[in-house]
Amino acid sequence: MAKNTEIELKLLLSREGLEKMLQLDFMQQAMRPDSYKKRRLVSTYYDTADMTLTQHGIAYRVRDKGDGSFEATVKTSRQSKDGLSERLELNLPLAEAKPELNGFAALGLGYELSELAPNSVHALFTVDVERITYILDYAGAVIELAIDKGAIHCGEKSDSIDEVEFELMSGTVDALLELKERIASQVELRAEERSKFARGLALLQ
């Protein structure tokens, strides 16, 4: 697995389906004891007035991580098939919840954000979710299970979020796909091809 690469499987389940999935024997066995965490994440996405970053295939956000810390994140364009996506993800710690454009080139981003004027970006929309996470050890892989519930807010518009993400922390994609197939054999689910960023952009229309 390449450094700074996010490999993620995004799924949609009913509340009943989610509860059933969490109680499956192989899921219970995979969950690390005491890995449960619950927190509120508030992420604001930014771009220039002419959407320069989006045109370059870049999503830029600033996140309040709910524990007194803040983080800027850059993600490249997301190619998704059957809910599985792979893309570059770069994270930069922040002292406060304000956009910082310097530092990403040193992390491996080909596009130089620092060439933009500091005040040239503005908030597009905000994603506010309650996130529950577990760490899974499955088929030699380490996988983070994230359950997000909340909404995307764009002015007076909003779109609800109720999704499940499996992010590959280490190991093979085959393990991630095998886990999906085992879940799908017992729980009704659908792949979510849209990222939160793409859904937020749709609200801007």
Put a short name on every predicted segment.
Residues M1-Q205:
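Phosphate-end processing signature that detects enzymes handling 5′-triphosphorylated RNA
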